[in-house]
Amino acid sequence: MRQFTMSQKLYMGVKRIIDILLSAMALILLSWLFLILCIAIKIDSRGPILFKQKRVGIHKTHFMIYKFRTMRLDTPKDMPTHMLADPEQYITRVGKFLRKSSLDELPQIINILMGKMSIVGPRPALWNQYDLIEERDKYGANDVMPGLTGWAQINGRDELEIDVKAKLDGEYVKKFGFIMDLKCFFGTITAVLSHKGVVEGGTGEMHK
């Protein structure tokens, strides 16, 4: 288990307060966008608006993550997108826009309010993504709260190989603190606007 300094432990408490305040504010301010996206998803394809999936949380506990549904109902369950033979065939029309813009991740604000996720942290792995979970163990990256965005997300995202992604998650844990979270937060704005690192079926196209 990763050992944290006293200042890092204190920051974890502060970070939780920041998460609650910002996620509550985001839910209120973005309620109009949630409504529009819910209507678009319902009109576009058959199925529920939200997609739930078992993911790995802090200390490798499991929780259900929330996303806007972007794929058809016949998509193989609990399978990472990069393991699908042709992921494009399962993605809905609205889903393509949501995934490219990262708006499909917005319902995770609920996960943050519930205390299962943080705004910044390693992206939560699928419960059966054993290769990524094992690699993260080497760096203590399973010992922090998973995040809506993180260091690996702004440094390659889907283009990264599993081992490279885990190393970046480990780098985040090593430098865990307010400054690192600020870098990830503002780096995310640039990454989302440029669609940087979004590759359907990735991990990954970027060379190690």
Q: What is the predicted role of each segment?
A:
Residues 51-90, 148-168:
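Short, glycine-rich, amphipathic interfacial segments at transmembrane boundaries or analogous
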Residues 11, 15, 84, 88-91, ...:
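Short, structured helix-loop boundary elements
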Residues 2-74, 111, 178, 183-208:
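A hydrophobic, helix-centered structural microdomain
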